[in-house]
Amino acid sequence: MDEHVDILDKNGEPTGESCLKSEAHRKGLLHPTVHIWFYTPEGRVLIQQRGKNKATHPLLWDVSVAGHVAAGEKIVTAASREVEEEIGLTISEIDLESLGTFKAVHKISEDFIDAELHHIFLCQLSVPLNQLTIQEIEVEDLALVPLFKFAEETWGLASMGKYVPHGPTYYKTIIKAIKSRT
């Protein structure tokens, strides 16, 4: 869906301008997104396999839930909305624990520069995996993996080509945060 997104300056502050997501990607304009990482008290991480028709990183494993923040939308509202859309789970804003932001710029092609400020949240998964309902156009599959396996596969990037390449610093931040809560 080509929604309007707010444009941010290099420091992540709103410029007061917005445009279609496709234009932001074409021009490499920084815009906000949300990443929500679900975990269980037993130390398992919920990951999603991106849909096969996604423009970027199709069929790679990624953050539990992710999406763009619509123009004028509150960050936590976008996070809650994306969770409900992608995995069919209704959560409250108080369920979200902010880990801060992470700036990422990826040149996908000459006319697609993905410049995003990820607002990262943790959320404890309170239902069994089989109670989640995937949004098939966005998500191919869901899996709960042990944190140690997830760390092994992303920290050292031992499984290059399996996960979206967010980079070791990003993954280390997520892994350490989840580990301290389980």
Segments (PLM) and residue ranges:
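Residues that flank catalytic or metal-binding motifs in active/ligand-binding sites
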Residues: 3, 32-34, 41, 65, ...
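Extended, positively charged loop/linker patches that create polyanion-binding surfaces
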Residues: 83-89, 102-106
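A short coil-to-beta-strand element that immediately follows conserved catalytic motifs
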Residues: 90-100
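Conserved hydrophobic "DFG−1" position in protein kinase catalytic cores
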Residues: 7, 38, 47, 122-123, ...
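Conserved Nudix-box catalytic region and its N-terminal flanking loop in Nudix hydrolases
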Residues: 23-34, 44-81, 85
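Nudix hydrolase/Nudix homology domain
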Residues: 22, 59, 71, 98-108, ...
